[in-house]
Amino acid sequence: ADAPNFLILSNGFEITAGGTTVGNNANGNLYTYYAFASDQSAAPVLADSFANKLYNGTGNELTVSGLGFQPSMSWLKTLNAANEWNLYDNVRGPFNKIKSNTTSAQETTGALSGFYIDGFTLRGSGYSLNQPGQNNISYNWKANPIPTINTDGTIQSLVSANQASGFSIVQYTGTGSNATVGHGLSAAPELVIVKKTSGVQNWMVGATVVGWTKYLELNLTNPAATASTTWNDTDPTTTTVSLG
């Protein structure tokens, strides 16, 4: 039977793991990264892959619908109150939020309780992003409703991918050594965003336009910095992202 740390996948199962060391590839740590690329052989259909949606909080259980697809990742922010940016995805599971403006580890007390065929549901009273009088925005991406075990890299990963739109959600456990991680897309990602979910760490960003010898930090205002220990000075390939 399923348990909170046991995930049924389209091609197997995954037992989640975690650790305490900082970094984007530290030994024993659990991470999620988001990879973006396009499939030149399959034209993306924007209406079927991404949608933003405004909604008003109610304080009661709320269904946000009208996306036109089942989202795999939702990024939520209150517009008229000082709440943090909350990010949810179907690889880490409902309730598990990471906050893109902070260094915080994943929290299991999030408002989003599930994804469904046309949107998502939110818990009621006591949760930000669904309070009476609050106006909120959601940005929603479609990947795969059922994550898949990926063995393309030297580190096994858990992937939810939409090759047509060039978007994937990837979870992996760091080793502390140079490694590669499969992203599930059919083209090399041009943008990769990584967050350590098992502990405190800045959000690491890699981009082709910046160069893969450098990195940015999503939650900070710092300029691009150079470090071979981030992407191992290696461009992503059509199957993997490199880690230093």
Identify what each model region corresponds to:
Residues 1-244:
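Surface-exposed molecular-recognition determinants
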